[in-house]
Amino acid sequence: MSEGVEAIVANDNGTDQVNGNRTGKDNEEHDGSTGSNLSNFLWHGGSVWDAWFSCASNQVAQVLLTLPYSFSQLGMLSGIVLQIFYGLLGSWTAYLISVLYVEYRARKEKEGKSFKNHVIQWFEVLDGLLGSYWKALGLAFNCTFLLFGSVIQLIACASNIYYINDHLDKRTWTYIFGACCATTVFIPSFHNYRIWSFLGLGMTTYTAWYLAIASIIHGQAEGVKHSGPTKLVLYFTGATNILYTFGGHAVTVEIMHAMWKPQKFKYIYLMATLYVFTLTIPSAAAVYWAFGDALLDHSNAFSLMPKNAWRDAAVILMLIHQFITFGFACTPLYFVWEKVIGMHDTKSICLRALARLPVVIPIWFLAIIFPFFGPINSAVGALLVSFTVYIIPSLAHMLTYRSASARQNAAEKPPFFMPSWTAMYVLNAFVVVWVLIVGFGFGGWASVTNFVRQVDTFGLFAKCYQCKPAAAAAHAPVSALHHRL
């Protein structure tokens, strides 16, 4: 892999050392001009707050719209309990990833290696700590997950805009938003998401509380039923969507590397998750309370919301946020591709953007093939997220500190709430076994079964997934349209 200069990004953490006292923020204090200060304020982020906004914003994107669908599959109680359970589980494995990053960087810096001109990624951490086989494993799962994570954001864009303008079908909207999302090739790195992360979280916060308040004001639909859970296949499909929801930390290493003091990341993801709970639980519970089993055929919560200015505002804000989240998922892929083709040290932002474009093309194509908003989340959660951000980090932590000398010289000791290394091993083993059996095993069976059912029903390259039939829409009374796609 090339160790080129990330030339188009200010070297925010160029002098930062895990083992030392210097931080990259020193580099930003060289220019006191108003223009430079404004640019740094909006464009160059590396603080603890920047990392918190990035984690929270990235974690809670379009899943807000599919969680009510999951509640209809799981039932109210299971939906709430599993959100809390997987939220805490995800926070733990994000903590493990941060510990392994600090360990890798500390070891390399002791050897005299500088990361001033290199963006560290998860597969490189695995390579440095455990060897080339783990590097290949991490690279395969991480890249595939981020690829499909980007696909899901693109599908969500087309699904959402359709509820404002249904003159174009969802496939056409996918073409349009694929071109729009391709502009993320011009965003250099996670340093440069400062203002976008802040705005993105604000937009999702509005959407979450709109869903909750609008559902409560609407009240329960006539004849509403809350039958879930009724079938095992639906139950585990819903559970894996929640596993997917709180598995958004595949970009943890890149977010940490963008920080001025990455060793401060340890509990940031947990703090972000606690805030995310205030968005996901009230909104999903309220929508499910109002519409019940109708959500089983409406994987996008917007489809059941009354059409008005408040809903349109929520749709538009979610579209903007999905563009941001698309960039979050794609940026690590851009880095990998740049290193593969030897363009990571290119100074020209335009040449670098041009080199990144081939990454967007397969994402665009896959979004057109599999436009199944909702079911695809569960499939990705079971088959990719389960390994990428739950099983692999837990196993990697156990193997990294398997020897007494490694534990004694660890850059990060067990956290204050863990009495010993043994307790950490027990918890890590539980995560591996639980996610392997419940997430990948039962979840994989259920989500793939449901996904295949969507393919059989709608076909690949579906022109307008879950759209209302034109004839039915023309004759439906206006009031009834509030409860239809």
Swiss-Prot record:
Protein name: Auxin transporter protein 1
Gene for this chain: AUX1
PANTHER family the UniProt entry points to: OS05G0424000 PROTEIN-RELATED
Compositional bias of kind Basic and acidic residues: 23-32
GO molecular function, one term: auxin influx transmembrane transporter activity
Mutagenesis / variant outcome for changing M305R: In aux1-102; agravitropism
Signal peptide feature range: none
Keywords: Amino-acid transport, Auxin signaling pathway, Cell membrane, Membrane, Symport, Transmembrane, Transmembrane helix, Transport
Activity control mechanisms: Auxin uptake mediated by AUX1 is inhibited by chromosaponin-1 (CSI), 1-naphthoxyacetic acid (1-NOA) and 3-chloro-4-hydroxyphenylacetic acid (CHPAA).
UniProt lineage: Eukaryota, Viridiplantae, Streptophyta, Embryophyta, Tracheophyta
Tissue and organ distribution: Expressed in root and shoot apical tissues. In root apex, confined to stele initials, protophloem poles, statolith-containing S2 columella cells, lateral root cap cells (LRC), and in epidermal cells from the distal elongation zone (DEZ) up to central elongation zone (CEZ).
Domain of life: Eukaryota
Subcellular location as annotated: Cell membrane
One Gene Ontology term from the biological process aspect of the record: response to nematode
Provenance organism: Arabidopsis thaliana (Mouse-ear cress)
Membrane topology: Multi-pass membrane protein
